[in-house]
């Protein structure tokens, strides 16, 4: 590679015009994109090996290859400084060079880079290896987050049992990482400055190519917050009725251990005790899936069928040969958190997921397969463009399908929902169930990165890092931990993405724009006609719509070759992200909640208001 770079750069000496230099630069890009794909493929392979089997040897190999790639990226950064790329006439060439100029953590000195890899590995390994003792059998101490603890948090209605598992998990998943996390923040900041950014927050926000993006999100969140407050208030009202005043206050934040999720990020698991019309059966096809003999493999085959029905790409054989679709039973430690992987070769795409046969996991399968479809659609692009238009786009694609898959119409289509009676009460129940996932998630997602931005920006004193985290959670989500937390604890890294250095804003963006995508796809498919009750947005199924599939193809095939507003425009003609489609989708629920809040004196805000 070095000889190739030198040869190409030598051509600059004989190029006397900008046009000739740009031709040479274009040739350089063609070659360096191929080299980057090769290097990244090797690094991804060892990362896959480590995430699939956490051993000291796999960690050593991953860190070794990552360090080698960091050196390579530094060489690339030096090479591109020799090109006057900012003056070139081709917007595409300038965009590729700009992308290459961002070296990320590779900008760190070798010793710092090695230390960063060590602390990140330590945090990720700590998270993956958490085991707790059984609440009812202290001699049994092999319960892992996925699936044992998550199933208990989802299904138990015993406040003391839930408090026990919450405390045990947070004490082990978060608190031990504090010193490593402090070093991580330090090195993250150093890397940002070496890349000519002020801090790590600016690095993450730069991916969205808009200096006002943070302000835009704040504005959208404020527009959506009244609906969140309504949902929050109603859930608290119902939980208070179920558990009583001693467990759930009528006026304070919600105890997060009662919300059916370890991080209180989505609350659909407690729908059985908070649904507006409990006499109406909730849409949950988990038991039916088991009765029909569903397997993880069948769930993925059905996801593949959905994409193909829209005229999109079929999963390649490599996917089926190399993916991990169930938790291995050989006792190994692995990262069970569902993830999709691109290996930067033709058709080498994989998913690693400890899949269980449940409705929720069925939707997760479609989410992860959205990433895979994106990988396949842009794999013809140069390496630097083989990513989403922005990080949120990548997360949104599969969620659009999940919105469709979760409708009664689609579940009836595939034979999983039987004897379903559709009326207004059933519709409100279904919308409320969706809100417990989609609306509840928004403030959670925002705080995951607002917290880390504050640390990167130095806005929170190190001696108050844990308190700062819980202040944000209460301010934005109106929740609180089940036990008092102090600076002896450190709880943010108890979320996988925080321990693993994964930017979380992508999920907030995804949960906003997926409704824009969904609305446009539904209109195109003839499944949604605004202001016509026969074709409501919340029961739209885009399965089989080649026309909707073409919208996805138009956008996904661009990869990151265009700014995200261009990609959005290719899908639906819009260039801005808004919360209007969310409001449209949930309007019937908003009207119902507004009425019931008055009738039952169910307040919306979680502070200083009485029922």
UniProtKB/Swiss-Prot annotation:
What is annotated as the active site?
Answer: 368 (proton acceptor), 497 (proton donor)
GO terms (molecular function) for this protein are: carboxypeptidase activity; metal ion binding; metallopeptidase activity; peptidyl-dipeptidase activity
Q: In which tissues is it expressed?
A: Expressed in the compound ganglion and in the posterior region of the midgut.
**In the Enzyme Commission scheme, what number(s) does this protein have?**
3.4.15.1
Every Peptidase M2 domain range: 19-607
PROSITE patterns in alphabetical order: PEPTIDASE_M2 (PS52011), ZINC_PROTEASE (PS00142)
Major place of residence: secreted
Function of the molecule: Involved in the specific maturation or degradation of a number of bioactive peptides.
Name listed for the protein in its UniProt record = Angiotensin-converting enzyme
Q: Which organism is it from?
A: Haematobia irritans exigua (Buffalo fly)
């Amino acid at each position: 590679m070095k000889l190739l770079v030198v040869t190409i750069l030598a051509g600059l000496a004989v190029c006397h015009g900008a046009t000739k230099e740009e031709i040479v630069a274009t040739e350089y890009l063609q070659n360096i994109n191929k080299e980057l794909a090769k290097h990244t493929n090797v690094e991804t392979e060892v990362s896959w090996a480590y995430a699939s089997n956490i051993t000291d040897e796999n960690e050593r190999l991953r860190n070794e290859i990552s360090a080698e790639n960091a050196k390579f990226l530094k060489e690339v950064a030096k090479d591109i400084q020799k090109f006057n790329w900012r003056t070139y006439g081709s917007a595409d060439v300038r965009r590729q060079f700009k992308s290459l100029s961002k070296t990320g953590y590779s900008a760190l000195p070798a010793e710092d880079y090695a230390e960063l890899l060590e602390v990140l590995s330590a945090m990720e390994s700590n998270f993956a290896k958490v085991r707790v003792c059984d609440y009812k059998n202290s001699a049994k101490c092999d319960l892992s987050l996925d699936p044992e603890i998550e199933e208990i948090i989802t299904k138990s209605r015993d406040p003391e049992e839930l408090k026990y598992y919450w405390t045990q998990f947070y004490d082990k998943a978060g608190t031990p990482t504090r010193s490593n996390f402090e070093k991580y923040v330090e090195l993250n900041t150093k890397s940002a400055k070496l890349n000519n950014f002020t801090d790590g927050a600016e690095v993450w926000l730069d991916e969205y190519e808009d200096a006002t993006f943070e302000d835009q999100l704040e504005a959208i969140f404020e527009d959506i917050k009244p609906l969140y407050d309504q949902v929050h208030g109603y859930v608290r009202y119902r939980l208070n009725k179920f558990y009583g005043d001693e467990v759930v206050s009528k006026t304070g934040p919600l105890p997060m251990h009662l919300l059916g999720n370890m991080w209180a990020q989505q609350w659909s698991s407690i729908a059985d005790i908070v649904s507006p019309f409990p006499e109406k059966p909730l849409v949950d096809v988990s038991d039916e899936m088991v009765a029909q003999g569903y397997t993880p493999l069948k769930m993925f085959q059905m996801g593949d069928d959905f994409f193909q029905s829209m005229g999109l790409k079929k999963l390649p054989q490599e996917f089926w040969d190399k993916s991990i679709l169930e938790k291995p039973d050989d006792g190994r430690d692995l990262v069970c958190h569902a993830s999709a992987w691109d290996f930067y070769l033709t058709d080498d795409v994989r998913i690693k997921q400890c899949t269980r046969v449940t409705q929720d996991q069925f939707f997760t399968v479609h989410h992860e397969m959205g990433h895979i479809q994106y990988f396949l659609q842009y794999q013809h692009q140069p390496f630097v463009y083989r990513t989403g238009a922005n990080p949120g786009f990548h997360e949104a694609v599969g969620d659009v399908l999940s919105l469709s898959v979760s409708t009664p119409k689609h579940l009836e289509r595939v034979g999983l929902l039987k004897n379903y009676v559709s009326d207004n009460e059933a519709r409100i129940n279904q919308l409320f169930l969706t809100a417990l996932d989609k609306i509840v998630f928004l403030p959670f997602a925002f705080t995951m990165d607002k917290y880390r931005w504050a640390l990167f920006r130095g806005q929170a004193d190190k001696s108050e890092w844990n308190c700062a985290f819980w202040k944000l959670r209460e301010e934005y989500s109106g929740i609180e931990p089940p036990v008092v937390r102090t600076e002896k604890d450190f709880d943010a890294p108890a979320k996988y993405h925080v321990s693993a250095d994964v930017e979380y804003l992508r999920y907030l963006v995804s949960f906003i724009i997926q409704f824009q995508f969904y609305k446009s796809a539904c209109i195109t498919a003839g499944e949604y006609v605004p202001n016509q009750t026969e074709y409501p947005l919340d029961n739209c199924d885009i399965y089989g719509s080649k026309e909707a599939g073409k919208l996805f193809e138009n956008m996904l095939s661009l990869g990151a070759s265009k700014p995200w507003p261009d990609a959005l425009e290719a899908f639906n003609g819009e260039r801005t992200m808004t919360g209007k489609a969310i409001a449209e989708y949930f309007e019937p629920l908003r009207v119902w909640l507004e009425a019931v809040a008055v009738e039952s004196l169910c307040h919306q805000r979680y502070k200083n208001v009485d029922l």
